[in-house]
Design a protein with these regions (language model features):
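Hydrophobic targeting/anchoring helices
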Residues: 310-316, 324, 432, 441, ...
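Catalytic domains of carbohydrate-active enzymes, especially glycoside hydrolases
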Residues: 354-401, 426-429, 545-550, 603-614, ...
């Protein structure tokens, strides 16, 4: 058990709250699990983890024993009761451990009674209250850039004096002011520890407050029959851990009292503390000299009267303890082999299997299964339909070898290839250069790099004027932080140097392995803004042929983004590979708990249709062999989706092989100028109205609202039944791509200085330009530049902002409006950014509440140029999202919005409505 500031566990009571003997050190602790409270009416209910705000196989959201006590956001005066035993008289602090995604209230009252008298009461869950959180210590609201790990523990500083003996804990719902969230109470803790601390609090040895205290007294009893010829103990091993950061496997032997005689049953032994029941626990059994299967039984009580299943399994095999077995009576222990064989049978006889049972032939399906030497593991992988990395005699692609272990440089590549046989080289397909990596940087202080930079500037024809008056010979890499023009070109030089590194590494891979090998590096989409990576890394490297395969991932269920973000992600991928037609390798993550089966099905089917050549499910099973990414055995629907999606795609494969995604006539700009400058722009958190209320938020943060606006515009157009492409400023300025499009959408406060003139000529020729979320007031060097304003028919735009960060599912539902736009008879709340427009020859279409222009259009030649002085895409999405806390995984994950304010939808789609684009197909909702 990890160390802490002070060891708390001396005596703990859980479940039925049987008293435990007081320890000789530390504090006295009582843990009252939420699922063991008795609701006195209909307001409270025992709630499974999947129906709470946190259901995951990793991170910092954990419900001990897979459940909690839940109540709707609007309930009041509902009561639930649990009887406990106080082990020793003392002053106890009363903690509530509950789920608290930021920005919402979760009000509930705890009362403690002894001898029929109320001795304690306190209201918990008020927004802005100081609490202890996963990973971060104390804060009022929790702020993490990737979203949130939202387990909170809260207690008043004042302790209550309790006598040894019986007590009653009462949970009561109270009036819950807006914005109000559902109350999910994991457990209540009473402890004589006076400090704000818990087991593993520092240095963050656990990912959830007080969870180790609760796990230490879990109650799951097992016994076994010794079928060996000698007295023996049963060895129990967990192959790995799942509860972050406790990933190491563990071993124990039972019973502790001594070996069991041959032919006899052991006494009942509580293995609950050995298990970590925030997840299913797989346990490998070993009994020296066992004659046949080892018989084991489980129960919920020490007497073995409340049975919870029985198994017989060979030495070295695994039985599974479901995480909710302590309270969910239908749950029983089971063997991994039996469960795998059941899923295999369902795949072969019960689930839809299209294409006559023939696997895909050209689209590769990857998914890691450990222990393929076990016949039942290989049989399951084959039955699900995977066509890579299977042992004989199962059908799989002839060229499917992969290195997911990564070769980051030539030396690692050579060492890896040296270990391959000729046959393995011939069958090798996918080489990884890294997981969730950046492309790295040059050695900025290297004199050789300075000389190379000077030559690069001259070769590109960069003039002193372009460098702000600095001659190319005098432009120094060391000045990149003080001269924004030199900095822009220095960064571009750095990028191209790194492209060359990976281009060479790709060539070496092909030379060492063979021409069939493709190279890539998985890009994590979880940095800010999520699913909008640096343009040079996500687009330009593929234009420069730095890698021969695009590799990306789908963890949308784990972050506060709308589900259709996967469409944006793959549009980004296609933007990157359109130059050189690289293969696309895409992680579609099935991990359960976490990913909903219906979302997974959409992603599994959508990905091949969006151009993906390799669908990779990362880690699948057996779940007890993986740390934090897997499909738990109980998620039958997830396994079914994997099987049916693979075979559904196999039937459509003849239409997909060699095909490309039909291009659209509508585009959204991926602006490198905005991307570069927003990443450099550090906003004090006090200027972000929501971040300002989060103590643990960083003092400054990069602005992301321009890039998020591009994403939300994309989704608004997608909802309008349009095929939408993503294009770059280089596409416009250097490749003259505008002729392929009827409508272009631009978002952000920066735009490449080469682009406005191209846009003006295109609009005059009939194109429709739509600009929002900043109107390109600055060029890529962060200099005020009126060129785009002139195209829009504006003299200026007075800009105000109250948000730096928008993670749509988290901030948009609660963000205070920065203004209101009157538009076509409707009133549209604006979020994040407000620009009062000053037209020259543009017509006003919408106004702010003070009458100043907010929306304009300029007729220019045969085309039109629209300007919207706010984040129109974000305003649109805000009207469709439910006002609810962000649920990380599980059944409460937000569905794709389908109902939006008509005026907000019209505002977001002014451009495409001005020039109707004929689409070959439409979809219903």
């Amino acid at each position: 058990m990890p160390t802490s500031i002070r060891t708390l566990t001396a005596s703990v009571v859980i479940g039925a709250c049987l008293a435990a003997a007081a320890g000789t050190r530390g504090a006295d602790v009582v843990v009252a699990e939420g699922e063991f409270f008795q609701p006195q009416g209909k307001g409270w209910a025992v709630t499974p983890m999947d129906d709470s705000y946190g259901s995951h196989s990793y991170g910092g959201m954990w419900l001990t024993q897979g459940g909690c006590l839940g109540a709707a956001a609007d309930t009041k005066d509902e009561v639930a009761v649990q009887k406990v035993t106080i082990p020793a008289a003392g002053a106890y602090r009363v903690w509530s451990k509950y789920q608290a995604p930021p920005y919402f209230n979760y009000l509930h009252r705890i009362e403690v009674l002894q001898n029929g008298k109320k001795v304690f009461e306190h209201v918990y869950g008020k927004k802005g209250t100081d609490r202890l959180w996963s990973f971060t210590g104390e804060s009022d609201e929790l702020w993490w850039f990737w979203g949130v790990d939202h387990d909170a523990a809260e207690a008043p500083k004042t302790a209550v004096q309790l006598a040894a003996g019986p007590a009653e804990i009462r949970l009561i719902t109270v009036a819950n002011p807006a914005p109000a969230g559902k109350r999910f109470i994991d457990f209540v803790v009473l402890t004589t520890e006076p400090a704000d601390t818990y087991e593993g609090f520092k240095p963050y040895g656990t990912a959830s407050p007080f969870t180790l205290e609760a796990l230490a007294q879990s109650r799951v009893f097992v016994r076994f029959k010794n079928n060996s010829p000698a007295a023996a103990k049963l060895k129990l091993t967990t192959p790995v851990g799942h509860f972050q950061p406790n990933y190491a496997g563990r071993t124990t032997e039972i019973p502790e009292a001594g070996p069991v005689p041959p032919g006899q049953w052991s006494p009942w032994v509580n293995i609950g503390p050995f298990c970590r029941l925030v997840h299913d626990e797989g346990i490998v059994v070993s009994l020296p000299g066992a004659a046949g299967p080892i018989e084991s039984e489980a129960a919920r009580d020490a007497a073995g009267t409340d049975r919870a299943g029985a198994v017989g399994l060979p030495n070295g095999e695994t039985f599974v303890v479901p995480l909710d077995i302590a309270w969910n009576k239908p749950r029983k222990i089971f063997t991994s082999q039996a469960r795998a064989e059941e899923l295999t049978r369902l795949a072969k006889t019960g689930w839809r299997t299209r294409n006559g049972g023939r696997k895909p032939q050209s689209i590769l399906y990857y998914g890691l299964f450990y222990d393929l030497d076990r016949p039942w593991v290989a049989a399951l992988k084959d039955a699900l339909g995977y066509n890579t990395l299977l042992p004989a005699p199962y059908a799989h692609a002839a060229v499917d070898g992969s290195n997911h272990g990564h070769c980051h440089n030539p030396e690692e590549l050579k060492r890896y290839v040296a270990g391959l046989s000729d046959a393995q080289k011939k069958a090798f397909k996918v080489m990884s250069f890294g997981d969730e990596i950046s492309l790295g940087e040059i050695n900025w202080a290297d004199p050789a790099m300075q000389a190379k930079f000077t030559g690069w500037l001259k070769a590109r024809g960069v003039t002193a004027a372009a460098l702000g008056g600095v001659a190319p010979d005098a432009a120094k890499l060391a000045d990149r932080g003080t001269n924004r023009r030199v900095g822009w070109y220095a960064q571009t030089f750095n990028e191209e140097e790194r492209f060359g590194f990976y281009r060479d590494l790709t060539a070496q891979t092909r030379a060492l392995i063979g021409p069939q090998a493709v190279t890539g590096a998985n890009y994590s989409p979880h940095g800010m803004p999520m699913y909008y990576g640096p343009i040079h890394q996500w687009i330009d490297i593929f234009k420069h042929n730095g890698m021969s395969m695009y590799w990306a991932e789908d963890y949308v269920f784990s972050v506060p983004m709308p589900p259709q973000t996967i469409s944006w992600m793959l549009a980004t991928v296609r933007c990157g590979v359109k130059y050189n037609k690289q293969k696309i390798h895409f992680y579609v993550m099935p991990h359960a708990p976490g990913q909903r089966a219906d979302f997974l099905r959409r992603s599994m089917i959508y990905a091949p249709g969006a151009g993906v050549n390799h669908v990779d499910n990362f880690w699948v099973g057996p779940p007890e062999r993986h740390t934090e990414n897997f499909v738990a055995w109980g998620y039958t629907d997830t396994y079914r989706v994997l099987h049916e999606s693979i075979y559904d795609t196999a039937e459509a494969e003849p239409l997909l092989t060699g095909a490309t995604v039909r291009p659209g006539r509508v585009a959204v700009l991926l602006s490198k100028a905005t991307d570069h400058n927003e990443r450099l722009l550090q906003i004090p958190k006090a200027q972000d109205v929501l971040m300002a209320g989060c103590k643990n938020a960083p003092a400054t943060i990069q602005q992301i609202i321009g890039r998020v606006e591009a994403q939300m515009l994309y989704l608004a157009l997608l909802h309008g039944q349009h095929r939408v492409d993503l294009v770059t400023e280089d596409d416009i300025a250097a490749d003259n791509i505008l002729a392929k499009y009827d409508v272009l959408h631009v978002a952000g406060e920066w735009i490449d200085h080469r682009v406005p003139a191209k846009l003006e000529a295109w609009v005059k020729n009939g194109g429709v330009l739509y600009a929002s979320g900043g109107l390109g007031l600055f060029n890529e060097f962060n200099e005020a530049d009126p060129a785009l304003l002139k195209v829009l028919g504006l003299a200026s735009a007075e800009t105000k902002k109250n948000l730096a960060v928008i993670r749509p599912v988290m901030e948009l539902p609660v963000a205070p409006a920065i203004g209101e736009i009157a538009f076509e008879g409707g009133k549209i709340p604006a979020v994040g950014l407000k620009q009062a427009l000053v037209p020259t020859d543009a017509k006003v279409l919408g106004t702010w509440s003070d009458g100043k222009p907010a929306v304009t259009v300029r007729e220019l030649g045969k085309g039109k140029a629209f300007a919207v002085g706010t984040l129109a895409g974000c305003a649109y999405m805000r009207t469709g999202l439910p006002v609810q806390p962000f649920p990380r995984g599980g059944n409460l994950c937000p569905v794709t919005p389908t109902t939006f304010d008509p005026a907000a939808a019209r505002l977001a789609r002014l451009g495409v409505d001005a020039r109707p684009v004929e689409e070959p197909a439409v979809c219903d909702n």
